[in-house]
C-alpha cells in the first residue's frame, strides 16, 4: 500500500516514499516510488505500478457492484465525494461493473493523480491522522490490466495463482485450512532495504490450545499462547519458556468505558437514581481512580500489562501535530499526566492514592444521597 507501520506502530513509507499535508490537514499529497512493478506468482513482471493503479483500486473499493461494500466506511468518511460515488454505483446496479476510475473522478471524488508518481487526496474536514488511514487496505492499488484480464467476477474471486504482487513475497503454495508458504519476490522494490526469509510458511492452527505442543515439537517457530498456557509458564520461574516470551506488535485500537448519563429502565422511563449518581464528579472518580485493570490488561499482554494502559479516547500513535508531537502526549499535558512515566507496576491514575478511594467513596455517597439518590 501507500504506507505501512513499523514495529512500534508508527507510520512509515511503503510505495509512497514521502508525503505532506496542507495547513489544516484537508489535502494530503503522496509522492510514490518510481521503481515498483507488478509481477505474477512466478515472479514475471507484468506491469509497472503508477498512481493510476491507486485510482483504479480506490474506484474498485467505492464501487458497490464490484466490491460489494467491503471496506468502504473509512474512505467514505475521510475523502470528499467518496460516499456519494458509492451511492451512485449502488443506484446503477449491474451497470456499475462498467464504470472506471475516470467516472469516479468525473463524479467529484477527492482523489487525483497529477502525474504518474503523485497522488492527492482531499478530505471533507481536517483529518490530521489521514496518513494512518492511507495505510489501510481500502487505499491499496489495483492493476487495471489484471482486472481487464480476469474480468470483474474473476478479479473478485482471484486466488494466489492469478493475483499480481508488488510486496516482499510471492505466495508459493496455499493449502486450505492448513498452510500458506511464501518465497521472496525477486522484483520487490525495497529488496536492498530489508532482510527477508528465504522461505516462510504460515501454519493454520484451528485450535490454539495445541499451539504450544506444535512449538515444542519444532513444527512452528512462534505461536500465540492461550491464557492458560501463559499462566502456567509465567507462574513458574523455572519454566524454560519464560526466556522466549515476547510481546506482540501493538495494534491501532482502544477500548473505553462509557457511562450512560440518561439511563432508562425497562419501561422506558428515566432512571433518576442512576442518572443523578453518575452526574456526580466524585461518583465517577471512584471508577476512574478505584478500578485496578492490571489483571484485565494481562489478558492481552501478560509480559507488560501496563503497556495496555490508555487514558485517552484514541490510542497512542494515531496522529501528530505539525510539530511532530503525538496527540495523546498533548492530552496528557492537559490532564497533568505528562510527568507520569511508565513504571510497569501501578496504573498512572492510581499512583496518587495507591488505589485508596475511601474518601472519594464517602463523598460519592454523601453528595448524591443529599439529593435523593439511594444506594
Located regions from the model:
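Short, glycine/acidic-rich hinge or "gate" loops at secondary-structure transitions
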Residues: 70-74, 300-314
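Primarily extracytoplasmic ectodomains and periplasmic/lumenal surface modules that are beta-strand-rich
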Residues: 37-39, 127-130, 307
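Gly/Pro-rich hinge or "lid" segments in bacterial periplasmic/extracellular proteins
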Residues: 93-98, 105-108, 115-117, 122-201
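Extracytoplasmic/periplasmic ligand-capture domains
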Residues: 7, 33-64, 168-300, 318-375
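A short, structured loop/turn motif at beta-sheet edges
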Residues: 22-25, 113-118
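N-terminal lobe/hinge region of extracytoplasmic solute-binding protein
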Residues: 1-23, 164-165
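Beta-strand-rich interaction surfaces with strong enrichment in secreted/lumenal proteins
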Residues: 19, 108-110
